[in-house]
Amino acid sequence: MPISRLKMNRKLISTLVVIFVMVASYASTAHEIPKPSFTIGVSLINDKALDGLAGTGVTIDDNDITAYFTVDYYVSPSLSFEGGVITGHEVSASLPSNASGTWHGTKSYSTSGALTITTKTDNSYLFGVKYEPSTTGSLSVYGKAGLMFWDVDFIVSGSGTLTYNGSTYNSKTFLQVDGSDPYIGLGLSYEISKNTSFAFDYVTTASTNAIEGVALDLSGYSISWLRKF
């Protein structure tokens, strides 16, 4: 089993243990358990994957817009399992000729001619828990945490040539990495009818390890529409 997959499985096991303990604590106090719900939303993502290239003459565009879909299954009035998918996104950095430095830890890079490096993150999948304390009004707060599973390609394009970690690349993918990292989030929701709400939240990853020097470092603000079945 690849090291990255082994680490991912260990994280998943740890998360499931935490979820089990939380469920055991709250399920005993459950009264009327809400119906399952689904959420559709959009996020403004900030991805710091290319921030290590910052320097003179370098232009970095580290924002993109994604969409997401999640399903929540309640095990108590306040606690639910959450699973979903986030659409892919990409960010880019334009580098001048003769730029050089270290990136992804101790890996060296240099450019011959101007070029653009783009990271393309495929659809990411998440699994976690969401906690929303009971309230008497329409406005409520919630927190969530879990694991995000991701897959990212680093691509060089343009007339220049990139030398990365001792190898030379031109107009091609030079690095592919996949893994998983914890995420945490806080949000506000407003109930507009018995089974429908709007929500606004902030989510960020909490990278615990780097795979081939790459650590997922995302954050984003989201607006969404929630509907209970």
Residue ranges of each PLM-predicted region?
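Outer-membrane beta-barrel proteins
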Residues: 28-29, 68, 75-77, 129-135, ...
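Outer-membrane beta-barrel "beta-signal"
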Residues: 37-39, 190, 217-229
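Membrane-embedded beta-strand positions in outer-membrane beta-barrel channels/transporters
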Residues: 39, 68-72, 126-128, 183-185, ...
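Short glycine/proline- and aromatic-enriched beta-strand/turn motifs that initiate or cap beta-hairpins
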Residues: 27-74, 81, 149
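Cleavable N-terminal export/targeting peptides
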Residues: 1-35
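Repeated loop/turn-to-beta-strand initiation elements of outer-membrane beta-barrel proteins
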Residues: 38, 78-83, 137-141, 190, ...
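Extracellular/periplasm-exposed beta-strand and loop segments of Gram-negative cell-envelope proteins
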Residues: 46-64, 86-124, 150-179, 204-218
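Residue-level signature of outer-membrane beta-barrel architecture
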Residues: 44, 73, 85, 131-133, ...
